[in-house]
Amino acid sequence: MTVKLTIDCMGGDHGPSVTVPAAVNFVRSHPDAELLLVGIESAIRAQLKKLKAQDLPALTVVPASEIVAMDDPVEVALRKKKDSSMRVALNRVKEGEAQACVSAGNTGALMAVSRYVLKTLSGIERPAIASALPNPNGYTMMLDLGANVDCEPQHLLQFAEMGHALVSALEGKDRPTIGLLNIGEEVIKGNDTIKRAGELLRASTLNFHGNVEGNDIFKGTVDVIVCDGFVGNVALKTSEGLAQMLSNIIKEEFGRSWLTKVMAVLALPVLMRFKKRVDHRQYNGAALLGLRGLVIKSHGSADAYGFEWAIKRGYDAVKNGVLERLARAMEENAGSLEQAARDASGAGQASPIAGQPAEPYAAQSSKA
């Protein structure tokens, strides 16, 4: 099976200087992958020439005349830049010419344009950003990580359904455990939204573990952790900052004297394994779930190594049939999700119209 992905080469802080080398490295190690490199043709070809990769048959350059800048408002990306590398890459997925799109572009713009071009799956009101965070036994899937700052209880239930389908597809688990991120394990804790979401999850057919706390994220307590995008994005950035700080402290301490430098040489194998386990670049690439196409969001600041991992996330998602499994799961649970929405509306909680852009998109950090 050939996996064909589109790469938004102009997205992110570094553009083609990062995205093109990552794409070249990826196809050289994955012979069953084909990548469509979308963006300013001259800039892409200059990088390919630099890498001596002009003739790689697995790479195809797709011209696009505009770039969505990292600080562009959503409205500009959506209404004015219709020939942007982001828009063209997503259109190729919509038209069936590729199976997934990978972009390091402006988060708010990517979510809004993806939603406009690809539309949402039946039963999904708001797509969510999901990514894997390391734990001692592998990883914990967490969502939402920044797409929806404010959520209603039924949205958190939808996120749980999508997280369940994603982990089932990637890990082969029939009933992955679901946790709801809260300030305590007790059902009486949390705000009204969290309490109501907990009730919906307990009444669902999901394997709901219950409330989990921030320290459970890296323990591997559950397979999937659900939260709103504000909390999720803060947790993600905090973990990345902590990992970087620990690496810097260790490097500084081992460089203090000749004795510590000798100790560093002796401990090098252990240090290298530690660095690899906490290197957030290996976890780069978050899936935009709930759309009628696969979209992978890379960090805007990612280097070539990190962006290559984002490409791998898209590749793995296609190979494991994530989109098909997600669509099937949403269809099977459509009744319970609709009932949850009606219950929430009956309790006086506003529910946005399905298919309409959610307000939080415009407020997203461009590098989330």
Curated annotation (Swiss-Prot):
One of its GO terms (cellular component) is cytoplasm. InterPro entries: FA_synthesis, Phospholipid_synth_PlsX-like. Keywords: Cytoplasm, Lipid biosynthesis, Lipid metabolism, Phospholipid biosynthesis, Phospholipid metabolism, Transferase. Pathway: Lipid metabolism; phospholipid metabolism. Its main location: cytoplasm. It is an enzyme of class 2 (transferase). Residues 337-368 are annotated as: Disordered. Its EC number is 2.3.1.274. Disulfide bonds: none annotated. It is found in: Cytoplasm. The keyword Transit peptide does not apply. The keyword NAD does not apply. GO terms for molecular function: phosphate:acyl-[acyl carrier protein] acyltransferase activity. Catalyzes the reversible formation of acyl-phosphate (acyl-PO(4)) from acyl-[acyl-carrier-protein] (acyl-ACP). This enzyme utilizes acyl-ACP as fatty acyl donor, but not acyl-CoA. Homodimer. Probably interacts with PlsY. PANTHER family: FATTY ACID/PHOSPHOLIPID SYNTHESIS PROTEIN PLSX, PHOSPHATE ACYLTRANSFERASE. This is Phosphate acyltransferase. It comes from Paraburkholderia phytofirmans (strain DSM 17436 / LMG 22146 / PsJN). The gene is plsX.
